[in-house]
Every structure is written in structure tokens, then in C-alpha cells.
Amino acid sequence: MKITVIGAGNVGATAALRIAEKQLAREVVLIDIVEGIPQGKALDMYESGPVALFDTRVSGSNDYRDSADSDIILITAGLARKPGMSREDLLQKNATIIKEVTSQVMQYSKNPILIMVSNPLDVMTYVARQVSGLPEERVIGMAGVLDTARFRSFIAEELQVSMQDINAFVLGGHGDSMVPVVKYTNVAGIPITELMSIEKINAIVERTKNGGIEIVNHLKTGSAFYAPAASAVEMIESIVKDRKRILPCTTCLKGQFGIQNVFCGAPVKLGRKGVEQILEINLSADELKALQQSASIVEQNCRNLDALLG
């Protein structure tokens, strides 16, 4: 198993290290356009192997040819958000970057699974699919896992219980229009509505929607990277080990939830082939409407890029 990570910034480097530490691949390649950065970080990671107890070969490069024959390619390249900048502000600039990155990696790997982390996430997943020509089930966006992790952590913090006992789904686009599904949220099987007032639930939903911005405002000069990297690696682990985890991921919906040909967050079964099944769970009327509105925003942003994609 060979996994390439595009982008040696905070998210990419953290993800590469977690992949190595979990020994999910025999080889991890970290690629970035800045000379010396991927090489230095990769060497540092590799030298941690004896004490972190892994034998994965980690290398860095500025040459896409070193990504050849990758099984999974994690794309984290792109501009990070700054305070006051929405994900949509990044649209045109990052779409150009992702178009180039995808074109490059597809020259050297025949049928990889692409996992997108770059923002605006849902739209960049669409760009990668259009440029790569890969089957839709092999181009997946990391959004719902991260948003759900934030939702779960906030609930656990409020209730003072283990995060491991919080079960939840956050669907829809990765942004202000995401849809935390309260109906399927429980604590060790106990419905969240029996443990928390609607007012507190709604406050946590709003905090989840602004989870990324909250971190950006703290950091001032960067954005979240530990949780995004961990979320991406959770997806990779399910694929590599063919665990068939049910995870909320950005995928191309084909009529599910009344949404047609739009990349949007939904519960999927994630295995060795990528997205092996989309689970069309029952939603309340309000949740379904919110999900469809979220998908509509993603679709409009995708249409705005059609000229760029040709």
C-alpha cells in the first residue's frame, strides 16, 4: 500500500505522520511545491520510527513522479482561510490549485482513491472528480467526519461524558449550511433530547457550524489541522483495512435525499473500493429541507467553476 499526501502544511504533515504511526501503508510520500519542506518533514517523521514503533518508509518530494502507483492520494494543498474569510472566498484560487494537482497525480497513478481535504471541500471534491475522470466512488471528501467529531466533542464537553459514547451524524456541505442531525444523535443509545434541552442542543449545533472559524479566530494566522488530519486518517484506515465503516463523507449523490449529481455530505459505507454504499437515512422534514438547501449552495458554487473546468 502506497499513500501520497499532497501538501506538506499542517494538515498534510500531521496526516502523513498518523498514517505512518498506524502503519497503514508500506510507503508514505509527502509532496509540496516548496523545496526542502516535504523532504525535511518526511525525514523527521521517518527518524521518529524507532521510538514511535513503525517501519513505514516516509519520504518527501517536489516531484509528482514520486507519487507514481499510489493506492490512495490525500489532497491537502491549497490556501488556508484567514480571519473573516469564508470557504467560498477561497473558491476560485483553490479550484485552480486543485485542478493542477489532480492533473499531475493522475499522470502517474492509474486508479487511485482521491480523498479531498482542501476547502471549499465539497466543491474541490467535484473539481477533482471532473479533472481525474475517476469513478465517483473513488473521489471522496473529508468533511462530515470532521464536523461530526466537533459535534460529538462539544456534546461530550457539555454532558461531561466520554466522547466515545457520543453517536452522531453531520451531513450536507462543509460550511455554514452543514446539517447536524439531532434525530440520530445519542449518548450510549440514549437520545440526546433526553439529556439536554433543545436550547443547549441548538447552541451546540451553531457552535459546530462555526467550529472551523472558532479555531481560525484563535490561531489568527492559520486554521485547524489536528482534527482534520485525524478525520482524514480515519477514512483512510477504513479503506485500507476494508473495515466498511459507516462515516459521513462528501460523495456524489444520485437521487438520494432528492439530490441529483451534487457532491454533498452523506452517510456512506467506506471500504477498499471507496464509497461502497450511500445510506439514505430518514430525516425530518426540516432536516431534509436543510440538507437540500446545503446541496443547492454546493451546486451553485460548482456551476461557477464550470468555465474553469472547461
Curated annotation (Swiss-Prot):
Residues binding substrate, per UniProt: R81, R87, N119, R150
Catalytic activity: (S)-malate + NAD(+) = oxaloacetate + NADH + H(+)
GO terms under biological process: lactate metabolic process; tricarboxylic acid cycle
InterPro entries in the cross-refs: L-lactate/malate_DH, Lactate/malate_DH_C, Lactate/malate_DH_N, Lactate_DH/Glyco_Ohase_4_C, Malate_DH_type3, NAD(P)-bd_dom_sf
Transmembrane stretches, start-end: none
Any Pfam family hit: Ldh_1_N
Documented EC number(s): 1.1.1.37
Sequence positions that bind NAD(+): G7, A8, G9, N10, V11, G12, D32, N94, V117, S118, N119
GO molecular function term, any single one: L-lactate dehydrogenase activity
Top-level class of the enzyme under EC nomenclature: oxidoreductase
Domain of life: Bacteria
Keywords in alphabetical order: NAD, Oxidoreductase, Tricarboxylic acid cycle
Primary role: Catalyzes the reversible oxidation of malate to oxaloacetate.
Family per record: Belongs to the LDH/MDH superfamily. MDH type 3 family.
Name of the featured protein: Malate dehydrogenase
Organism: Chlorobium luteolum (strain DSM 273 / BCRC 81028 / 2530) (Pelodictyon luteolum)
Gene: mdh
